[in-house]
Amino acid sequence: MAKIQFIQGVDEEAIPDVKLSRSQDGANGIAKFYFDKPTVFDVYQGEITGLYLIDEEGELSTRTVYAKFINGKPQSIEASYIMNNREEWERFIRFMERYAKQNDLSFTKAKN
């Protein structure tokens, strides 16, 4: 089961918008996650420790996570996951395929 967490042990219910970019040689890439009104704020009032992508292969994580507040209330979370080689890219794609299938999501290629 593929899941996303901001606090280990607390699953995030909001489905993110994910944008991927990759270098031309395929050696590295970045995934940018955007969560509008994430549910973590409803169940946890402490510090967000990172973005954790968990599936049967293990865990991918990043500490590059930013929360946006409007009038003192949490509104959204943005996170970036950097992949430094082809193996990390392929591992991330396997996670996203599982997460997408589980949540009935699809991939849309950007228009140039």
UniProtKB/Swiss-Prot annotation:
What membrane topology is given?
Peripheral membrane protein
User: Major location, coarse class?
Assistant: plastid
- Where would you find this protein in the cell? Plastid, Cyanelle thylakoid membrane
GO cellular component annotations of the record: cyanelle thylakoid membrane; photosystem II
Whether Coiled coil counts among this entry's keywords is: no
Q: Does the keyword Membrane apply?
A: yes
Q: Which residues form the signal peptide?
A: none
From its record, what is one biological process in GO terms? photosynthesis
Q: Which InterPro entries did the record assign?
A: Psb28_c1_sf, PSII_Psb28_class-1
Q: What is the top-level taxon of the source organism? A: Eukaryota
One Pfam family for this entry, by name?
A: Psb28
**Which HAMAP family does the annotation name?**
PSII_Psb28 (MF_01370)
Subunit structure, interactors included = Part of the photosystem II complex.
Question: What is the protein's given name?
Answer: Photosystem II reaction center Psb28 protein
Look up and give the organism this protein is from.
Answer: Cyanophora paradoxa
